[in-house]
């Protein structure tokens, strides 16, 4: 214990093995017998000491909050509050309509999250992030209750993780073709943007063709969302379920379609 320099647990360390992700030898140490909350460190017989670490309730709360706030920082099509986003704050970006590839049809697909390394918005990785966050809500009692992370929707009676996920879901619903039920794969420029701020990327946004990959991922997370959100907003849950069913019908009619490949001069992320 760091507070009083007392030893609270002893044991042997075995099973050392090289971990390429860490770049060093690692071993698992079980100190589940330590029940008192506090700050601790591990000291080896050689005198080597670990970093100090906490034991107690809620030790991952700050990491969880930071993770949700990261998604807020990725929001597209809306102004980011400097009190929340700090250096990442900006005015509303990418507010224009997108053009369906190979046509002159314009479509409103504003909203959603920017992708990891560019300002495109992609259904496939977006759906993966949505599913991970919905599982977090289901598996974590803390996440299921926390409504005070500090996003604009905090305090509305809905867990903040669901508020943040809904921002992406609302965008995904716009990505579904109203007639066929298929889902456009992504909305990006023709090429990756330069190293510029979000509001400075002014390339024409293009909706890449509908894909089974995007449509399948969309159907899955919308079906999941229809269950999770029902206790908070039944009308929204119904919309998610209807969208999932429509996407599923599209997939039944296009079972032989191949995975996604970039078309024309578009070279942004494929997520096939």
Regions found by a protein language model. Give the residues of each.
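Ligand-binding face of N-terminal immunoglobulin V-set domains in extracellular IgSF glycoproteins
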Residues: 1-60
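Acidic/aromatic-lined carbohydrate-recognition and catalytic surfaces
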Residues: 19-22, 49-65, 144-164
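Aromatic- and glycine-enriched glycan-recognition loops and surfaces
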Residues: 29-32, 114-124, 151-170, 203-213, ...
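Well-ordered alpha-helical scaffold segments within catalytic/enzyme domains
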Residues: 44, 130-153, 170-175, 217-234
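An acidic-aromatic substrate-binding cleft motif
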Residues: 48-124, 128
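Long, well-ordered core segments of solenoidal/helical folds
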Residues: 58-83, 164-180, 241-259
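Glycine- and aromatic-rich loop/turn segments at beta-sheet edges
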Residues: 101-116, 142-149, 176-203, 251-272
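A conserved hydrophobic secondary-structure block that centers on an alpha-helix together
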Residues: 155, 159, 199-201, 205-250, ...
